[in-house]
């Protein structure tokens, strides 16, 4: 592990840090996930976003099933060291497992959440079944 890479990062009690994927061109927030030290190291080594799945309890590379990989252009660490923003180039234009550009596709309209973004590709087409 690269000590310089990891020493400024404040991982939580579970060994995780919040990781935000932001489109390098449009600056749109695409998704929020978690990284452990190994996922962060793998991200730096490969140039592609790797995360840690809390539900599956394992590291994974974004796009390993869907092909919608995230090429990392830059990493930014916040002032407290407990959140990372990755400026990325999103392969295929789809970051969300629902087939949308962004996981942030719902907008509050005063009294209800409304879907604001269209599905670009059906989940069944991406994964073979619903994810």
From Swiss-Prot:
Signal peptide (from-to): none
One GO location term (cellular component): cytoplasm
Cofactors, names only: Mg(2+); Zn(2+)
Cofactor binding note: Binds 1 Mg(2+) ion per subunit.
First-listed, main subcellular location of the protein, grouped into a coarse class: cytoplasm
Pathway linked to the protein: Amino-acid biosynthesis; L-histidine biosynthesis; L-histidine from 5-phospho-alpha-D-ribose 1-diphosphate: step 3/9
InterPro entries, per the entry: PRA-CH, PRib_AMP_CycHydrolase_dom, PRib_AMP_CycHydrolase_sf
Annotated positions binding Zn(2+): 79, 96, 103
Catalytic activity entry: 1-(5-phospho-beta-D-ribosyl)-5'-AMP + H2O = 1-(5-phospho-beta-D-ribosyl)-5-[(5-phospho-beta-D-ribosylamino)methylideneamino]imidazole-4-carboxamide
EC number: 3.5.4.19
GO molecular function: magnesium ion binding; phosphoribosyl-AMP cyclohydrolase activity; zinc ion binding
Pfam families from the UniProt entry: PRA-CH
Compartment list: Cytoplasm
Keywords, alphabetical: Amino-acid biosynthesis, Cytoplasm, Histidine biosynthesis, Hydrolase, Magnesium, Metal-binding, Zinc
Keyword Transmembrane helix: no
Transmembrane is among the record's keywords: no
Binding site for Mg(2+): 78, 80, 82
Function noted in UniProt: Catalyzes the hydrolysis of the adenine ring of phosphoribosyl-AMP.
PANTHER family, A to Z: HISTIDINE BIOSYNTHESIS BIFUNCTIONAL PROTEIN, HISTIDINE BIOSYNTHESIS BIFUNCTIONAL PROTEIN HIS7
Quaternary structure and partners: Homodimer.
Family as reported in the entry's similarity comment: Belongs to the PRA-CH family.
Protein name, entry field: Phosphoribosyl-AMP cyclohydrolase
Lineage: Bacteria, Pseudomonadati, Pseudomonadota, Betaproteobacteria, Neisseriales
């Amino acid at each position: 592990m690269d000590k310089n890479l990891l020493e400024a990062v404040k991982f939580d009690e579970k060994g995780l840090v919040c990781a935000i994927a932001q489109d390098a061109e449009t600056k749109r927030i695409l998704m929020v996930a978690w990284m452990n030290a190994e996922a962060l190291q793998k991200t730096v080594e490969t140039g592609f976003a790797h995360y840690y799945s809390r539900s599956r309890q394992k590291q994974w590379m974004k796009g390993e099933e869907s092909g919608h990989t995230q090429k990392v252009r830059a990493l930014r660490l916040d002032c407290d060291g407990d959140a990372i923003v990755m400026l990325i180039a999103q392969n295929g234009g789809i970051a969300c497992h629902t087939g949308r550009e962004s996981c942030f596709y719902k907008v509050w309209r005063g009294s209800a959440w409304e879907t604001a973004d269209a599905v670009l590709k059906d989940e069944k087409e991406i994964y073979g079944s619903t994810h």
